[in-house]
Amino acid sequence: MERSDAKRLDRRQDGFGTRWFDPKGGRIEVLDVSPALSTPENEQIIRSRMAEVAGHGLPALAPVRRVERNAQTLSVVTATPAGVPLAELLAAAEFGLVDLSDHAAFAVARALVTRVGALHALPGAPIHGALTAAHVIVQRDGTVVLTGWTFANALSSLERTRTQFWNEFGLVMPPSNQVDQQSDVTQLGFLVLSLFLRRVPCGRSVEASLADLVEGASAGEVAVASTDEALRAWLSSAFHLGGPPFANAVEAGLVFADISVDVECVGSARPSLDVVVRQMCGELPWPPIVAGGAEARALAAAG
């Protein structure tokens, strides 16, 4: 595919590379991999990871069509489902372009926890390894599919510090700094936190401010008496901030499932989320700008 014929899919370029959408190939994401991950050694690691995982047909993971080299550019070509990257959804919500309701945010969070938990429950302790908002596709019915799973072993080979993983790739790592099921849980916690904040926290000091961000987390309208307290305890365990940390997403999922919420409110999430995803996919007109976006929500919570 000629890059001049391609359309940028993800406006938020990250340390993994640059994402493109191939208009001639259906729902195809082409990721031009960053130099750090596209060395000849890491190319072989990525190809091996693709072959290792592809044979299992894991429904949580979007299928990679191929890994190809064109001169100095290594590209990972992935078949993505209809939907919108979570990074795009949160960016739109942050700036008030769409109204991602509390019940829709909780529904996506629950779908994410369930999806990663199902992955971790499989034999052989499989991992994703690179859970960021750019690697989550949210579908109209609220289900999610994960991309970017080819990089787990390559990331391990880089020997980055926790701070470097964050600054370079936007990956929040546990104290062990190992790419494993616990790092998946920590990154899952960051995605859940981002959903309730309606933005992806950024900046070089995010790790240092996690405790403060968790303290302000709220499920909003779906909350009942103990919801927010239970949500903060869950996030604290995911981030190793207090209480026993989760060993994997199976444990995290069992605890998340016990968080009490307004069932009727969460049950209404699907039509709301369907509208938001269709708006972002160009199938419905954009709504009037939501005044204040995340800033107004934060001020309301503080008051």
Residue positions per predicted region:
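Flexible N-lobe loop architecture of eukaryotic-like protein kinase catalytic domains
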Residues: G55-L61
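Activation segment/activation loop of eukaryotic-type protein kinase catalytic domains
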Residues: H128-V172
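ATP-binding glycine-rich loop module of kinase domains
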Residues: K7-G55
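C-terminal lobe helix-coil module of Hanks-type protein kinase domains
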Residues: L171-V290
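Structural motif in protein kinase domains
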Residues: P81-A93
